[in-house]
A protein has these predicted regions:
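Single conserved hydrophobic/aromatic residue that forms the stacking wall/gate
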Residues: 2-3, 7, 187, 192-196
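Solvent-exposed alpha-helices and their adjacent loops that cap or buttress functional pockets
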Residues: 29-33, 81-83, 120-122, 181-184
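Glycine-rich phosphate/diphosphate-binding loops and the adjacent beta-loop-alpha structural elements
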Residues: 4, 24-27, 33-42, 188
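Short glycine/threonine-rich loop-to-helix capping motif typified by GTGT followed
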Residues: 42, 53, 73-84, 102-104, ...
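Redox- and metal-dependent alpha/beta enzyme cores, enriched for Fe-S-associated oxidoreductases
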Residues: 33-60, 73-78
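Peripheral docking tails and interdomain loops at the edges
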Residues: 88-183
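Conformationally flexible catalytic loops at phosphate/diphosphate-handling active centers
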Residues: 1-4, 8-27
Length: 196
């Protein structure tokens, strides 16, 4: 495992030298004392960042933790990047794992947080919920991000959910809010028809 970490660090440094872009396995974006955080990877990160920017202007303590390198998974880097103030976390996976207890990223995040708490590395264990998005190429827009942050604010959030995907079989779909983003976010215009 240590050898993998050395190879990872060398590869990330080589990439930085070649491109001028420096990445870490996990990168945090948002309020430094965030209480609600979404953890995810991939192309949906940009949408989350834009919604976080708007929510920060409204005084909300939110953020997004971007997974830049999933394997080998580094619990150390995850814990360093996640604000200690966080009270609730939504882990979003773009996959469905039939027969599994939960999706892969969710399981890794839960394990990292639980072990850190058990080892005394964290004083509190945030509430962690897991969601699926983007299955069957379903759109993941600003309304989906708003729905996830709203769910994190709920007194009893769903432990498992889907967002942007209408699921009338399991009824795990989060309701999508109206677009409340300012007009300047015209490139984030929401669809006028419901997700199906």
């Amino acid at each position: 495992r240590q050898r993998q970490m050395c190879i990872r660090d060398r590869a990330m440094n080589d990439f930085s030298a070649a491109t001028g872009r420096q990445y870490q396995p996990f990168e945090y974006y948002g309020h430094p004392q965030a209480e609600r955080v979404i953890i995810l990877m991939g192309s949906a990160i940009g949408t989350c960042e834009e919604v976080v920017d708007e929510l920060l202007t409204r005084g909300e303590k939110v953020g997004v933790l971007k997974v830049r390198l999933y394997r080998p998974f580094s619990a150390k880097h995850l814990l360093q990047a996640l604000p200690g103030s966080v009270r609730s976390v939504a882990v979003l996976d773009r996959t469905k794992e039939p027969g599994a207890q939960a999706e892969p990223l969710y399981l890794d995040v839960m394990t990292a947080l639980a072990e850190a708490f058990n080892n005394g590395e964290r004083e509190t264990l945030p509430r962690v919920i897991g969601g699926r998005y983007g299955l069957s190429s379903k759109e993941f827009g600003p309304d989906c991000v708003l729905a996830v942050f709203a769910e994190l604010n709920a007194a009893k959030p769903k432990a498992r959910f889907t967002v942007g995907i209408y699921d009338d079989v399991t009824n795990l779909s989060l309701p999508l809010p109206e677009n409340t983003l300012p007009v300047s976010y015209t490139h984030l215009t929401l669809p006028t028809t419901p997700y199906v």
